[in-house]
Every structure is written in C-alpha cells, then in structure tokens.
A protein has these predicted regions:
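GH16 jelly-roll
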Residues: 1-157
Length: 157
C-alpha cells in the first residue's frame, strides 16, 4: 500500500509494439479505495502510448469535468518509435502543478491556475498509487492487428 504525494517520479521503460497494444504508466488517487469514484479521485498519466502511434508520447490529467476524451492532454512525437529503446518517463509534481518529462526534457506543464481548470477541482493534493500496465485492444488503442500475438512492456531497475 505505497502512495506518492509530490516529488519527482521517473520510470525507465520500453513500450510494447504492435497495433492494438496500449502501454501506460499512470497514477490514480488512493481515495478510490475509500469510495471516491473516478474521475473525482484524479488520474495522472505519466505516459500512454499505443502501437498504432509508435512515435507518440501522451501525458494527461483527469479530474472532475475533465476526464476521458476531455482530459488535459499534451501529445508530442518522438524521433523514433518508443518501442525501439528504453526511455525515461517522468513527472515533477507539487501542490500547484504537474510537469512531464521524456529523457530529462520537459514537454508539458499544467498548473491548477490553468485557464482550462477555472472553476474545476484539482484532486492532485493527496496520495496516489502507481499503475504500470499493458492492455491489448479497447477503445483507445483500437482494433488489434491479428499478427500481434505477443506484447511486452519492459522496465529496468
């Protein structure tokens, strides 16, 4: 039952390849265990990548009134497919903002004073727990390539 609240969190990972794969490194509010529902509990996506967009790095926050397809998202393109090498995915998080990094380079920062958040809750001032997962298929990655018979999300220590 490990929780994180603020600081710098970095994960070295190599995402899966293959159309239909969905690699994700994310945080979910620990108050979910107390009955607070999503998205009110908050979600911080450190990285999402689908095999159908092998160059794409996506970092997002979800909260009340800005969740799912309406999450606050920044998408950038890597210079080569993310499945070719290990990369360092990170966030720097404090009571007022969250900043995303790829290999030490900042690519997005969202603060609770962001115009898109005016009048909306900022559920990121609590403990969160880490989820590292690989999914196959679903609404986000789309249809699965029939040739995709093996997928792996790798990490290093």
């Amino acid at each position: 039952d490990i929780g994180f609240k603020y600081g710098y969190l970095e994960i070295r990972a190599k995402v899966s390849e293959g159309v239909g794969s969905w690699s994700a490194l994310w945080l979910l509010g620990k108050n979910l265990a107390d009955g607070v529902t999503w998205p009110a509990c908050g979600e911080i996506d450190i990285l999402e990548n689908t095999g159908s967009h092998p160059f794409q790095i996506q970092g997002t926050i979800h909260g009340p009134d800005y969740s799912g397809e309406n999450g606050l998202t920044k998408i950038i393109q890597a210079q080569k497919p993310l499945s070719e090498d290990f990369n360092n995915y990170a966030i720097s998080w404090n009571e007022n903002s969250i900043e995303w990094f790829i290999n030490g380079v900042s690519y997005n920062k969202i603060s609770k004073t962001d115009p898109a958040l005016v009048g909306k809750d900022w559920p990121f001032n609590q403990e969160f727990y880490l989820i590292i997962n690989l999914a196959i298929g679903g609404w986000f990655p789309g249809e699965v390539d029939p040739e995709l018979v093996q997928a792996e999300l790798q990490g290093t220590g």
